[in-house]
């Protein structure tokens, strides 16, 4: 339970000061994480008791929808969103310009007859330390191959176009003209570059493969698009009708960024006056410009519709990219992939994280007439064209609370993949399930129960908690002697199994340890700017 020094201010606000409303400034506090039920709280739960009957308003960054929803659900907070810090160019483009030009010349004209240029590229690559990130050799008299140059080109373009945050956002202070320009470019340039390239693809000027190649887009479209946008944004015309339709969204984003600062305070005052704080989706403005303007009441996603059709395609693509990278490096498919899922990415991608796991397993969603994902279908082995990959999924407490039905769906997916019989390729899910069952029986679990538990692959915080408990070990490093103690603490705190309705949240530490064993790939999808 919270100490009396924590309880006293909240109780004084209610009983002594007799406040009309409560305002928190995030992100984030700890009131929403005090002990008690995850959902359906009562006065016997600390979060509910400490807020009482006070209207609760919470200034919250629009970029952290995952944790914001916890405050909305456990403290009935009205989340008044505020802007994220402004964006800035990383300044890396100029540093890599010459290297990129040399790489493109080699790729366009071939490495034959350009040995000296190839040597120069390698020397510069080694000087910049890029070879270490890509695990390329640094032998000075051995130029890179065309395949290695393509990898180097993609990696360098990614760094050169990297976005980064500038100074902290100060509420009440509009972005400077420079910050406004850079943030508007960050929100709009990539989308416009791809739209321009898509139009060229439809006209037959480029191929679909080129359209899907980030390096190609970054080199052939992004510089021109940024130049067009910068010219328009630095001198916006008074008559918007004079602006070509493809540039109008960027001007709208600029106006929404300007309006956000005043809108944030106006929304708070409107709420305190008993008015409505209008709703809006939450998320990062770069990923979802619809969060603009800020100063609105942030909401989540309908978990039952996830993964939505776009997220399904994104998840498949990401899963295939993972497998391609692994097979390219190791010459074989991974047998088991471990995922760590947080609520924020689940919400902002509308389920692309789930889609990755489904596609690894070789199953796909089945939707009802309202777009809800209500069932799963096994993708035939011949259609999948590869082994079914075993998985283990670790989830945050926030994701467990907002998407419990999806965790059950993940377990159903594992069960479906485990029972697949049409195997033209190995089924690592089935072999993993058999091994799980065997290990459980050896530890004394009844054969019937071991069979039921063998398909469990989803684990999260125990006792309705929200923490791995690792922070405590970090803060009290003198209290442990061996790193194995930290690993054991992690298993103790994250070993609750989710996905089985009859045994929801049951602590299965041994099962969790077994599920984590022999993992080939570890992934935590993150995309916040």
Feature roles, as predicted:
Residues 1-529:
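Ligand/cofactor-recognition surfaces for anionic moieties
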